[in-house]
């Protein structure tokens, strides 16, 4: 996915196993300084599942968005909902509704690309995941083609 993101004109600042607090630390240490972004896609929080409550995740994302807006005030920000996880599909769906409302409240667009990773049953499409949590190449292709980078 990294190559697709970069060829679409985005700088990919994501790291495997990142949580919201890791992104905040990097922002505090200059990751968004020294350039003017036109568009920013925020796709973080899945690794906070099981560690933090839904309220803490939404609050953390909201705080992160405000920090991004301070440092990149002209950028158009799109927030991606969390991807579903095996056994947590309904919890993620509820959480994404809260994230959508929070994004709108903060003047950000929202996209739920995770719903494209579900089978008709509402459970994850196992063919798109390595382990029920991490996407395989087919899952990455679904995300890249979802409108996330438009």
Region locations from a protein language model:
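A structural micro-motif
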Residues: 8, 75, 106-108
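A structural signal for isolated positions on well-ordered beta-strands in alpha/beta enzyme cores
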Residues: 41, 76-78, 109
